[in-house]
């Protein structure tokens, strides 16, 4: 079962400022785990006035202990014993300054065999006020949605279909006597594919519910820096945030 997260809120800043802050949001005091950001493609359509940007983020993270315990070592790849790892995130965004909206979609390029995460943002200038006074230039509406889908359950079902119903959750995920302790195998063996998938998605949803408010706070920090010191203060803040170890 796929898990979803959604949130709506408003920034007390104009759309132009918010859309600029989006591209300057890493790193910030709430996102020092972002090791690097590279722009790999950018194009402007003169007919529509839309700017399309593709970026690649490298993020450091720590896999939840419950997930580390759940997965056989063959699935942990380069993750450390404490679950520390890093992954690339591909982000595509489109900005339409004339119409006053921006949309972005980010997805993980690593760990897809464990969990696929698709995060979508929409930033929008409020519609003209009913009284006909024009736009509220000091606010921007935001909608964020995150879709979490574990791939492990799909692989278990497919491999069981090929190998027969006698295959255990551990065996179809690549675990074995050399890959996981017997105690761990016994625990996984008692789980059905749906339970494994649901557990990973549920743990990830709980983590998303905690991280998204922090991401919102991080954007507010960047917005405040833009308001008080412009681009210079933002760049100085980014430099300081990079120097702080997570």
Feature-to-residue mapping (PLM):
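Hydrophobic ligand-binding cavity/cleft-lining segments
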Residues: 1-72
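Short solvent-exposed loop/turn micro-motifs enriched in small/polar/acidic residues
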Residues: 2, 86-88, 114-116
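Amphipathic alpha-helical protein-protein interaction segments
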Residues: 4, 8-12, 44, 82, ...
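Hydrophobic residues positioned within well-ordered beta-strands of beta-sheet architectures
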Residues: 5-7, 53-55, 89-91, 104, ...
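Generic structural detector for well-ordered beta-strands
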Residues: 8-10, 94, 122
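Hydrophobic, Leu/Ile/Phe/Ala-enriched alpha-helical segments that form helix-helix packing faces
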Residues: 22-26, 93, 219, 223
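Glycine-rich portal/gate segments that line the openings of hydrophobic small-molecule binding cavities
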Residues: 40-106, 110
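Terminal "cap-and-tail" regions of soluble proteins that handle hydrophobic small molecules
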Residues: 102-246
